[in-house]
Curated annotation (Swiss-Prot):
UniProt similarity note: Belongs to the SfsA family.
Annotated gene: sfsA
Name this polypeptide is given: Sugar fermentation stimulation protein homolog
Molecular function GO terms recorded: DNA binding
InterPro entries according to UniProt: SfsA, SfsA_C, SfsA_N
Length: 243
């Protein structure tokens, strides 16, 4: 499953990040521009001084910035990493609608943004009389082929995991969490105990209570993003190095 960007990407050099949602960069023409950053995570391993990033131009006079960051180059190689947190939902939803997302291919797509239990869930699926709530998380942090989520403390993410666990235990719906790595150089995904132990413990408990944990990679090019391969999600606590 492939999701095209449908726009030309412009190479730029990362200069600064004044706040979570703004990046200052230098285009190859030498012009310095301000760009919106869709991913509010720390991204400290990607947005390094002089890092290569790619921007798309947004022709919208009402916007504060006329550029948006699309992806960056991983420092350890030629792999591109998507920095647009809206892409995983778009990509996976498109695959689910066509029943081409293999880990859940037996489930039929019903709708996006389904509200239940006080929260809005990314996708609702159905298989016969059973229904499944799916939450999709964007993963960018990776070290030596292992991806970690989250890359910053997420109270909202912890709340969602605990709510899904309660729903699973109630028997009203089946539940699943998909951790989609927005990069291809990943062989395993783990909760980041060294960054957010509360989320990580909640995810481990969710798995014990029957919430399905799915891991998947994606491949990013200058033309678009496509689904990669399923990878293992390991919720066991290990000693990791925190920065």
């Amino acid at each position: 499953m492939f999701l095209p960007f449908n726009t030309r990407l412009h190479h730029a050099t990362f200069l600064r990040r004044p706040n979570r949602f703004i990046v200052e960069a230098r285009l190859d023409t030498g012009e310095e521009v301000v760009a919106h950053l869709p991913d509010p995570g720390r991204l400290k391993e990607l947005l390094l001084p002089e890092a290569s990033i790619w921007l798309r131009h947004v022709d919208n006079p009402s916007r504060k910035t006329q550029w948006s960051v699309v992806c960056s180059q991983a420092p350890e190689g030629d792999v591109l990493v998507s920095l647009d947190t809206t892409l995983p939902n778009q990509l996976v939803t498109k695959a689910l609608q066509q029943q081409e997302f293999l880990p859940l291919c037996q489930w039929a797509y019903v709708r996006q943004e389904f509200t239940y239990g006080g929260s809005r869930w990314d996708v609702l699926l159905r298989e016969g009389e059973k229904q499944l709530l799916l939450e999709i998380k964007s993963v960018t942090l990776s070290e030596a082929g292992v991806a970690y989520f989250p890359d910053a403390v997420t109270a909202r993410g912890t709340k969602h995991v605990k709510e899904l666990t309660a729903i699973q235990q109630s028997g009203d719906y089946e539940t699943a969490i998909l951790l989609l790595a927005q990069r291809e150089d990943v062989t395993e995904i783990r909760p980041a105990y060294h960054i957010d132990p509360h989320f990580s413990a909640a995810l481990q408990e969710a798995e014990k209570c029957g919430v399905r944990l799915l891991g998947h990679t994606s491949k990013v090019t200058l033309e678009g993003i496509e689904l990669g391969k399923p990878v293992k999600v390991d919720t066991s606590e290990r000693k990791e190095t925190s920065d």
